[in-house]
Amino acid sequence: MAIAMIPKTMSTQHPDNAKMPAWASEKSMIRNDDEVEEAYQCYTIGIKEVMWDAEGKDVDTHVLRKLISKNHEFFEKNVLGSDIFLTYRVPNPAIEGTERKVLTETLESIPVNYDVFNTVYKRDIPPIFEVILPFTTSSKDLLNIAKYYEKAVAARDEIELYDNVMVKNILGETKPKKINIIPLIEDKDSMFNIDGIVKNFARAVSAKKMRVFIARSDPAMNYGMIPAVLMSKYAASRLCKMNDDIENYPIVGVGSSTFRGRFSPENIEKSLYEYSNYYTFTLQSAFKYDYPQDSVKNSINIINRHERSFDYLEDYEEEIIKNAVNKYVINYQKIIEKLAPAINNITMYLPKRRSRKLHIGLFGYSRSTGNVTLPRAISFVGAMYSMGLPPEIIGISSLLNMKDDELDIIEKTYINLRSDIMESSSYLNYEVFDALKDVYKIDQETINMIKADVKYIENNYGIKSDLGYERERHNYLSSLMNLAFKNHDFENTRKYILDMALIRKFIG
């Protein structure tokens, strides 16, 4: 179906917040029903779209009914599907096992929500008409969902039950007849093939406009921060080039930590400049809850006024980026595979901010390296920072192996590279090298590779020595956390991890 007004701000349920919102029913965790209140609160502070995670367990497909019961008058003035939006993130049946039929439940709820909304507000507007499909790797992934909805949900109206009695005579007409599918592209190969995915799907469904979602967090965990930024720039460039044929509105999935995008109220102008080719930006939990509300609201207004640029890379520059990414990934993944057991152990003691199980990531499917399973990106980042080893550092000495033209393109394309490296490396605790060996039993070869990364930063960017009280305290707490973990003092392990997260203003 046609795309309505395109929102520029998208709230997500990513549990990266260190602080808890005042409206939460519990001190440490957002419960299922709290998420309905969360969605309502997001709309009231100017966020135009809420992504509702229908991928995990305990999904609530009655969210719209609960939402409008919060404040009937608000949703009379702010029309869902026209002024503000609710967008499902659905399971990808090509990857999911036991949860794949949650897709059916979620898609079936779309016409139900239409009926509820139309009954209450007397408007012929579908309040939900788009879904996000994670792990999209081909146009067929998208076509499967689009056609399933059209033929298994909407087209059953015309099924004759008996003697000219149709399904629509019993259940009423199904609306909307079609839905828009937003591909969420998360892996390297698919990002480098974004043209084929988008063009082939648009051709198959005769779409003139599309929203395309580019992941930023999982690519960073799977390939490294610098490759993740470069891949997001590559994807945005390709989308800019095809805009004359298929009008597109890219979404970038950014978080507050530098590793996951450094998209926070205190860095909003730099972030919008870095990702200027994107139209819509995700506002994750740390963005919303770890900063003063005036700052959050002001940042939301800035994003809502942001104009997308259409600058793009030359074809030869895109090829250089692909080569640079492939070079960088080699050392990065070698190190991460060795650190995986330590990371997985520490994540057990991170604060849990959501009660229901949300979506899982590429490493959870072991689709990226094939050798290790890692937690979600938020937990991954939280574990690394808690050890005193910012993940932004890992693999950066690979730049020594780059050709001059590759380095030039990296520095030109990743605008805030120096700023981001200096920010994240200020959380490096040099005592982590002893902890890696003594506490986490990491082999010396891997430790030496990490030391080479640190040396590269020292030589090329510098690491702040005058850190200030909070950064010094963070370093001290990371040493205490490693000591507590070594001695199986898991109560204090949890305490130190939370204290550090509060300093950073994000868990991971």
Swiss-Prot record:
GO terms for biological process: carbon fixation; oxaloacetate metabolic process; tricarboxylic acid cycle. Keywords: Carbon dioxide fixation, Lyase, Magnesium. SUPFAM superfamilies: Phosphoenolpyruvate/pyruvate domain. The keyword Ligase does not apply. Its cofactor is Mg(2+). GO terms for molecular function: magnesium ion binding; phosphoenolpyruvate carboxylase activity. Its EC number is 4.1.1.31. It catalyses: oxaloacetate + phosphate = phosphoenolpyruvate + hydrogencarbonate. InterPro entries: PEP_COase_arc-type, Pyrv/PenolPyrv_kinase-like_dom. Homotetramer. Belongs to the PEPCase type 2 family. Catalyzes the irreversible beta-carboxylation of phosphoenolpyruvate (PEP) to form oxaloacetate (OAA), a four-carbon dicarboxylic acid source for the tricarboxylic acid cycle. This is Phosphoenolpyruvate carboxylase. The gene is ppcA.
